[in-house]
Amino acid sequence: MDLKGKRVSVIGAGKSGIAAAQLLARKGATVFVSELGTMGAEEMQHLREMQIPFEEAGHSPAVYEADFCVISPGIPPHAEVVTTLQARNIPLYSEIELASRFCKARIVGITGTDGKTTTSTLVHALCEEDGLRNGYRAYSVGNIGVPFSSMVLDMKAGDIAVVELSSYQLERSPTLKPEVAVIMNITPDHLDRYAGELQGYAAAKFRIYANQGAGDTLIYNEDDALLREHFACRDQFPFNIMSFGMEPACKGVPDIRTFFLEGDTLVAHTPDGDEPVLVTSDFLKKSFRGRHNISNVLAAVAVAGALGIQREVVCQVIREFRGVEHRQEFVMTINGVDWVNDSKATNMNALRQALEALPATAVLIAGGRDKGNDYAAITRLVEKKVSLLIALGESQDKIVSAFKDVVAVKAAGSLEDAVLLARDAASSGQTVLFSPGCASFDMFKNFEDRGMQFKQCVHQLSSW
């Protein structure tokens, strides 16, 4: 991609926007950064250091003086700046798309509603260990928090870039071509962006394989009904297909590669027969538990199979894995009560998985900015698993109304109050589970900030 002499506007000055602007400037483009809100001092300093002009608190006409634009994923498709750019036929690309144009490394792309961060982290750990033995480097970038653009120029042929991909990022990545693509699952989420339609959300996820061909591999979750139906006619796709699942329908089918659970053993099924990989007791622990995490491990093992990573490496890395921060993260035990931070649970499916993973009953802290949640879908599970539900945030009234007839419910005015209520209610042997099931932006900067504040509150309890 030759950028010399090209004028490029970057819309949005978050981490990915700044990284994109820096990459564009290094490649010779004339760059302009435009931020609708207020920019931080650090972001402005980064741009000044590279003499990149910018604006904040609005988008001026200068934005439209561009050959193409790189747009931050959080900007909705109906935003005025987007519709104006489209009306002027100015191409819009994601930061992922931009970086991929310069990527010499092999790309492993991982998407899905839930599980993609844990799986991406695990796949990166597998590649990192394998790379130490075989002379390549592994990078973890994308939606996981490190912009692809900030690392891509360091990547060499033979390296592996593990790229976590959101639906927003995939929307505007028309030439992205992962060597290995993974779809973890597709359940209702972000439907406000897709006119309330699951099909639109799924279509964005399916863009991950749009450019794959012979020699590339698509890995999907056989347990997900939507994915199972979508990939039922494998012959219509030009790439290799592998699957994983607890009890996949293709188990025992010749010429199919799949990874499944048989009893407590993870098994690789190939045309040559079935081969046990490892048992769940090797990796399930207090800090990494639940059937959904078995699914995440199966996905990572499938990627290892596609990349040719040896079983010895797979077993070593998975046995040592301790989970990911804010994903059912064990914080500590206080007076016999386990405290678990699941701040990343921003939708109903993630909350359901957290409840299903509980070894005993729990005090549940939930709530935040509602995303059109259907709480009726988990009513029976809450009744079975929860002794007290503490409702928090903008969705507080909706949660109280949804569950007041099946479980004791209390409302909390702040996260600190919620933690104190949970402390007073929980008994030895129980868990206090912070799994909001909602977005964080009503009270916090993001889910990471929300999780950190929860952990701080818990640590303060232990010092009293």
Swiss-Prot record:
CC terms in the record's Gene Ontology section: cytoplasm
Taxonomic superkingdom: Bacteria
GO biological process terms on file: cell division; cell wall organization; peptidoglycan biosynthetic process; regulation of cell shape
Compartments, as annotated in UniProt: Cytoplasm
E.C. code: 6.3.2.9
Catalytic reaction annotation: UDP-N-acetyl-alpha-D-muramoyl-L-alanine + D-glutamate + ATP = UDP-N-acetyl-alpha-D-muramoyl-L-alanyl-D-glutamate + ADP + phosphate + H(+)
Protein name in the entry: UDP-N-acetylmuramoylalanine--D-glutamate ligase
